[in-house]
């Protein structure tokens, strides 16, 4: 028995641990010691990647279909971690293999805030919905 179309997939247990781009690491350190203020322009947006980025450069973002970045509301940090407080749905996906995510602020020229790989890549086909359950995207600093 096949899944009804469009398919819906849920991913759990994704963690971004200390995967901050160099520019954000520097901005947060400057803010921490008071040399430069850091101003966040929200909301935080979650983007899906078909190739992962690193500290120096962004990955390759999904394109096509009705794909678009999704606004992400977050819990209050506790124990060095913070998670998404609501389910996140990417509807109308194009055919793609999603291997990671990146977080962006939402100002005129969005800044990449964090990045990370999925523990297991997810193949989606045209029209699918890719879903992240509440509390499944975790950011942590140690």
PLM region descriptions:
Residues 9-100, 105-142:
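Small cysteine-rich, disulfide-bonded extracellular modules of the LU/uPAR three-finger superfamily
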């Amino acid at each position: 028995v096949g899944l009804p179309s469009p398919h819906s997939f849920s991913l759990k247990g994704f963690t971004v641990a200390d995967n901050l781009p160099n520019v954000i690491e520097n901005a947060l350190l400057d803010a921490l010691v008071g040399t430069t203020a850091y101003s966040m322009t929200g909301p935080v947006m979650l983007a899906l990647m078909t190739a992962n980025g690193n500290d120096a450069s962004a990955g390759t973002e999904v394109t096509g279909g009705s794909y678009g970045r999704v606004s992400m509301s977050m819990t209050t940090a506790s124990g060095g971690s913070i998670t998404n407080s609501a389910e996140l749905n990417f509807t109308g996906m194009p055919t793609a293999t999603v291997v990671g995510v990146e977080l962006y602020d939402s100002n005129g020229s969005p800044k990449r805030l964090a990045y990370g790989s999925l523990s297991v890549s997810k193949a989606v086909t045209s029209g699918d919905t890719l879903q992240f359950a509440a509390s499944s995207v975790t950011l942590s600093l140690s």
